[in-house]
């Protein structure tokens, strides 16, 4: 038997027929191995009427290739042996589509395995697909022309012999000659691969449950494992010398591969298995600026501005070519170059000036921030003077009832009990008395301030917020242990109180709080002034009767605080005294800030003779400065009588020795105002 091609064949038409119709009898099939693709057919085959792919039409030719079967009468059949193809691919596709229309109208059962008829019922737009020959597998009685010979995972009425799946890399081939698979795939790829869709070759890497098969690949009856393994169009894949496919053969929907990219077809035939990128995607690549300049001739070349010296060189070269070079041109060029050099120096100087201005601005910002810190610190200290507080428990409140409840609470007593395990009982009792006495003095100070000036109404934080902002005023509780805000509802509060996380965090916070309270108590007792008071308390005396100054020492404020010079201490104390602690409490912190700024400017060691002509005023300032400096530096004052002696002893040696004493000269302060501030300083605690 001669060389055969398993792609084209002839169909019996029953009686003599010159129209090339197809018979429906299964027994009328002749093996397709008798038809040679390049040579004449066997003489045992009756004469038929072959249809050619010529450019004229589908008219029957006079070629005689023999009968279909032995003993049968001579008849005209349609042979699909292609003649030398001189037409372009579009005309061939049009003729194939015309034949497919004829087949879809007749609808005979001849085992025709072309998938174009099946696609005719689904979508008429897909009938413009490459025509595929009949598969060389044995015909089955239940085979219909609307079912392709291969199977997807769709719910077709598959027989027992057509249970192959498209999900694997290779199909479950039922061909009685499986060794012909690779060769048939190669021949089919060369014979019809030129009409195949560019994006079909990407379907072999799909997974069936998630990626639907391409619509353009359904009419093909060839085993997809063979076509895709060979690269979709044969072993070489697509090449540039082949004509482009027809416009109708392109896929109507974009084809996506497993990498999520459109059109993973062959790319110049260089990538195996058809995994290269589609050629239609080349113009979709992002074009970056300067990317095209990289090449063998210009590697990494960037666009540069012309340097300053190129302009006179160019002018000189042009003058040489013209032959009229003169000294004036050279002088002009030199002047231009000099001007450009001076311009460059000016730019450099300007940049330096800008850097200097930025540095000056940074210094101004630093000074401004430092002033703001001082204002905030003064405001906080002024607020602390009129705020009830328990230093050991770190409890603060502006309400007298709340501090009284705290001093009688279980939490406060447990804290003192824990401190008593580390310190003597008498010392713990002294701490309790000290806290109570301090809060009494704070209450007295608050009453005095309220008598002087009536409290200003508190500004409403919700002022200017309307209903269009959808704000609502609510009450909430802040859990310090869990750092959470809980709406003030009984059910929500109880739920949080009985939660496991809250109980765990509460126990941890209580342990940490006890350790902190012990540290604060030790810091308070380490103060020299408190030590003197503790000694009197242990002797049975009352250190809180007729006390000149109430010196509150907070452990957390003493820790890590930098030591200040006497001049700075005096300036801060005088500023606090002048503000009278009233304006800062009511939110008017600007006057205090102004006084602090004035004091900061004039602070420094000043001789007593330069303070003023009035000796009485200088004496008052001298006594006030020495007193406040000694009080603020770690609370070195003694009791009321000892404090007066200390002031006299400190003032006399300073005046006798003539050493510079820090005195602050504040203009605009009269003698009666100084006396008033001196009286207030005795009742105002400093920190």
Curated annotation (Swiss-Prot):
Pfam families reported in the protein's UniProt record: AKAP95 (PF04988)
First-listed, main subcellular location of the protein, grouped into a coarse class: nucleus
Composition-biased stretches (Gly residues): 109-118
Bias kind Low complexity: ranges: 649-666
Compartment(s): Nucleus matrix; Nucleus, Nucleolus; Cytoplasm
Assembly: Binds to dimeric RII-alpha regulatory subunit of PKA during mitosis. Interacts (via C-terminus) with FIGN. Interacts with NCAPD2, CCND1, CCND3, MCM2, RPS6KA1, PDE4A, CASP3. Interacts with DDX5, CCNE1. Interacts with NFKB1; detetcted in the cytoplasm. Interacts with MYCBP; MYCBP is translocated to the nucleus and the interaction prevents the association of the PKA catalytic subunit leading to suppression of PKA activity. Interacts with DPY30; mediating AKAP8 association with at least the MLL4/WBP7 HMT complex. Interacts with HDAC3; increased during mitosis.
Cross-link for Glycyl lysine isopeptide (Lys-Gly) (interchain with G-Cter in SUMO2), residue positions: 315, 563
Annotated region (Required for interaction with MYCBP), positions in chain: 572-589
Region: Nuclear matrix targeting site, residue numbers: 127-152
Region called Involved in condensin complex recruitment, residue ranges: 523-565
Protein name (Swiss-Prot/TrEMBL): A-kinase anchor protein 8
Region of interest called Interaction with DPY30, as start-end residue ranges on this chain: 1-210
Region annotation (Interaction with MCM2) ranges: 1-195
Tissue specificity annotation: Widely expressed. The protein has been detected in liver, fibroblasts, granulosa, myoblast, lymphoma and Sertoli cells.
């Amino acid at each position: 038997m001669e060389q055969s091609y398993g792609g084209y064949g002839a169909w019996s038409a029953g009686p003599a027929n010159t129209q090339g119709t197809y018979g429906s009898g299964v027994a009328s099939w002749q093996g397709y191995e008798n038809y040679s693709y390049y040579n004449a057919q066997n003489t045992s085959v009756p004469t038929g009427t072959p249809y050619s792919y010529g450019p004229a039409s589908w008219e029957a030719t006079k070629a005689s290739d023999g009968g279909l079967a032995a003993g049968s009468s001579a008849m005209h059949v349609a042979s699909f042996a292609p003649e030398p193809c001189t037409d372009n691919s579009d005309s061939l596709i049009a003729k194939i589509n015309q034949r497919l229309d004829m087949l879809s109208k007749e609808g005979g059962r001849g085992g025709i395995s072309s998938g174009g008829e099946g696609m005719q019922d689904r979508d008429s737009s897909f009938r413009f697909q490459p025509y595929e020959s009949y598969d060389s597998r044995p015909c089955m009685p239940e085979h219909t022309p609307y079912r392709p010979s291969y199977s997807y995972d769709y719910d077709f009425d598959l027989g027992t012999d057509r249970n192959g799946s498209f999900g694997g890399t290779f199909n479950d081939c039922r061909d009685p000659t499986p060794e012909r698979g690779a060769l048939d795939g190669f021949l089919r790829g060369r014979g019809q691969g030129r009409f195949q869709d560019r994006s079909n070759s990407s379907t072999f890497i799909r997974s069936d449950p998630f990626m639907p098969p391409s619509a353009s690949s359904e009419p093909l009856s060839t085993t997809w494992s063979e076509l895709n393994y060979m690269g979709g169009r044969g072993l070489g894949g697509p090449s540039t010398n082949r004509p482009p496919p027809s416009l109708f053969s392109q896929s109507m929907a974009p084809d996506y591969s497993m990498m999520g990219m459109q059109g993973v077809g062959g790319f110049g035939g260089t990538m195996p298995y058809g995994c290269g990128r589609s050629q239609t995607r080349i113009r979709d690549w992002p074009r970056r600026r300067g990317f095209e300049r990289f090449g063998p001739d210009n590697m990494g070349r960037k666009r540069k501005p012309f340097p300053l010296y190129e302009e006179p060189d160019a002018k000189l070269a042009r003058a040489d070519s013209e032959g009229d070079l003169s000294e004036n041109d050279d002088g002009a060029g030199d002047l231009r170059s000099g001007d450009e050099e001076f311009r460059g120096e000016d730019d450099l100087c300007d940049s330096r000036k800008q850097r200097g201005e930025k540095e000056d601005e940074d210094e101004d910002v630093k000074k401004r921030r430092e002033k703001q810190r001082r204002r905030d610190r003064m405001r906080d200290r002024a607020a602390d003077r009129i705020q009830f507080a328990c230093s050991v428990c770190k409890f603060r409140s502006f309400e007298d009832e709340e501090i009284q409840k705290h001093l009688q609470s279980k939490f406060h007593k447990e804290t003192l009990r824990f401190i008593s395990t580390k310190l003597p009982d008498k010392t713990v009792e002294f701490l309790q008395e000290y806290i109570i006495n301090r809060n009494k003095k704070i209450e007295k100070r608050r009453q005095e301030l309220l008598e002087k000036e009536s409290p200003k109404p508190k500004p409403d934080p919700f002022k200017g917020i309307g209903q269009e902002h959808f704000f609502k005023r609510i009450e909430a509780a802040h859990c310090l242990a869990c750092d959470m805000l809980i709406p003030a509802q009984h059910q929500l509060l109880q739920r949080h109180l009985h939660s496991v996380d809250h109980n765990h965090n509460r126990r941890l916070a209580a342990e940490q709080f006890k350790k902190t309270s012990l540290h604060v108590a030790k810091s308070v007792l380490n103060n020299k002034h408190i030590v003197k008071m503790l000694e009197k308390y242990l002797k049975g005396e009352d250190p809180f009767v007729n006390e000149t100054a109430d010196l509150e020492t907070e452990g957390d404020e003493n820790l890590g605080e930098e030591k200040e010079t006497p001049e700075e201490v005096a300036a801060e104390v005088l500023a606090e005294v002048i503000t009278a602690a009233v304006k800062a409490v009511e939110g008017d912190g600007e006057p205090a800030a102004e006084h602090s700024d004035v004091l900061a400017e004039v602070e420094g060691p000043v001789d007593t003779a330069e303070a003023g002509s009035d000796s009485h005023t200088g004496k008052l300032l001298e006594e006030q400065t020495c007193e406040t400096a000694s009080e603020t530096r770690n609370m070195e004052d003694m009791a009321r009588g000892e404090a007066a002696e200390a002031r006299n002893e400190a003032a006399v040696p300073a005046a006798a020795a003539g050493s510079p004493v820090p005195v602050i000269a504040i203009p605009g302060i009269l003698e009666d105002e100084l006396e008033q501030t001196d009286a207030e300083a005795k009742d105002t605690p400093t920190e």
